[in-house]
C-alpha cells in the first residue's frame, strides 16, 4: 500500500487530508494538468521506476515474479492509454477509512478537488478504479459516468482473481453542485 500511495503522490499536483481530531480519516491525491508546470514527466517516471526496483529488490520472491508484474503493468498502461478520455484533471487516489465511510468525508474531498480543478480551467475529470475494492457506486452517485471497462491485469495479478478496471469521467461543463446532493 505504501508504494501505491507514493506512486499516486508522484503524479499528483493537488492533495488534501481529512482529519477528525488527531486522526487521519481520508485523503485525496489528484492531478490538475494546468498546475503541472515545471514538473518533468520523464523525471517522475524515472522516480517511479526507481521505487519499483527498490520494492522488487527487497523481496527475492517478488524479484522472481517481477517480469510477470512488469508485463501486467505494461499491458494495463496500454489499455489505460487506449480507453482513458482526454482530461484536464484526474483523481489519482481517494481513500476514506472504513470506519468513517458514509459520513460525507469522501464527498467533501472530491468537492474540494473539483472546485480546484474548475478554478484552474479544467473541463473533464477522470479516474481509474476497479471492481474488487472500489466504491464505484459513490462515483456514479457523484455524477461520474463510466466511459470504459476492461480486464485489469495488475489488480488481477495481485488479487489472484479476475478484476475489471473502470474508467470514469465527469464533465465539469455539464456538472452542477445540485446534481451531487
Specify the residue positions occupied by each region the protein language model found.
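Glycine-rich phosphate/pyrophosphate-binding loop shared by adenosine-nucleotide-utilizing enzymes
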Residues: 22-27, 89
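Conserved GNAT acetyl-CoA-binding A-motif
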Residues: 88-89, 117-130
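Conserved catalytic-core motifs of GNAT/GCN5-like acyltransferases
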Residues: 128, 145-162
Amino acid at each position: 500500500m505504501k508504494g501505491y500511495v507514493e506512486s499516486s503522490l508522484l503524479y499528483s499536483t493537488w492533495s488534501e487530508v481529512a482529519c477528525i481530531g488527531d486522526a487521519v480519516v481520508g485523503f485525496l491525491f489528484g492531478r490538475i494538468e494546468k498546475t503541472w508546470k515545471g514538473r518533468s514527466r520523464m523525471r517522475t517516471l524515472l522516480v517511479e521506476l526507481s521505487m519499483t526496483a527498490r520494492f522488487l529488490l527487497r523481496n527475492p520472491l517478488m524479484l522472481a515474479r517481477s517480469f510477470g508484474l512488469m508485463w501486467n503493468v505494461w499491458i494495463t498502461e496500454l489499455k489505460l492509454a487506449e480507453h482513458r478520455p482526454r482530461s484536464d484533471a484526474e483523481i489519482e487516489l481517494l481513500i476514506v477509512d472504513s470506519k468513517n465511510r458514509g459520513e460525507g468525508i469522501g464527498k467533501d474531498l472530491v468537492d474540494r478537488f473539483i472546485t480546484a480543478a474548475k478554478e484552474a480551467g479544467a473541463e473533464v475529470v477522470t479516474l481509474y478504479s476497479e471492481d474488487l475494492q472500489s466504491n464505484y457506486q459513490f462515483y456514479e452517485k457523484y455524477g461520474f459516468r463510466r466511459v470504459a471497462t476492461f480486464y485489469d491485469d495488475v489488480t488481477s495479478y495481485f488479487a489472484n482473481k479476475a478484476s475489471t478496471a473502470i474508467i470514469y469521467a465527469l464533465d465539469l461543463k455539464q456538472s452542477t453542485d445540485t446534481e451531487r446532493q
